[in-house]
UniProtKB/Swiss-Prot annotation:
It is an enzyme of class 1 (oxidoreductase). This is 1-propanol dehydrogenase PduQ. It is found in: Bacterial microcompartment. It catalyses: 1-propanol + NAD(+) = propanal + NADH + H(+). The lineage of its organism: Bacteria, Pseudomonadati, Pseudomonadota, Gammaproteobacteria, Enterobacterales.
Amino acid sequence: MKSFSLQTRLYSGQGSLDVLKRLTNKHIWIICDGFLARSPLIEKLRDALPADNHISIFSDITPDPTINTVVQGIAQMQSLRPDVVIGFGGGSALDAAKAIVWFSRQFGIEIETCVAIPTTSGTGSEVTSACVISDPDKGIKYPLFNNALYPDMAILDPTLVVSVPPAITANTGMDVLTHALEAYVSTKASDFTDALAEKAAQIVFQYLPVAVSKGDCLATRGKMHNASTLAGMAFSQAGLGINHAIAHQLGGQFHLPHGLANALLLTHVIHFNARDPRAAKRYARFAKACHLCPDNANDTAALNALIRHIELLKKQCALPSFADALKDGKQAWSQRIPSMVQAALADVTLQTNPRVADASAMQELLEELL
């Protein structure tokens, strides 16, 4: 038996921030990073909130939010006792807000509403039961999954993402594709998650190059924003796989941006997983659903078309090679493989990978990357 549930109310499109006008006479706590706290976007958010609200801001969020950041946030939440928490920013801010609210509730601190407002189009965190918290001392990222992590409300306003730089647009867009593809070949995939994943990927292949080159196009940004959420809904239900299990280690140990790490792994992982007959057929079906090959193409031709189009998409987005992305980390690569293998094997996202991966298979995959 498989289950499927949507627990977050969505508001999308230009002007969707206006839904916040319903919040009156509340203590609203905004969780974001320091850059956003000083940017015009925070004023745009403030302007959307009625003047009778009391607003507090927690802006100590860094990329890959840490355990310490979450602990600080819980302490502030205990002190402030807000009515509403708004996670505002990229995946790091949304993950931190969700984790802070979740852990605070376990201490008996309740809020009326948790709102997620993404300012990048990538993680899908606004509609998932997942968050990722880092331990910089150990170089490990911990993905957490719990239905209590779903935000109550998500707002997808494309005007909040038009200023995202091309490189970040590319990285986060490839994260969307990875979410869709891993959900599609997951052992927990269903007709419902397939539909979400297919639509998300179709949008990425069509609109991501335009979003990277013409970031001020609201229609394109809106499409990518929706794709991110569609893929988030897909993987939140179906799970992920070895791509994310390894990407978490590349982020934790080499500080590669998460979306970039996923993008650089993607075709290697497809080759790895396609040795499983079921996964190979699913990849072929995915390629046909995204119109990357003729409908009558055989599975091998469809699989090759998928790999070819992903490599083309990476080129269109001007992504670096794996070696260039690692920079000085290349010297430490070989010696860190054993620890990355062990951490990836323990990563919860590996549980729904279509091909079973043991330590030797994982090591072989990592060794071929560089």
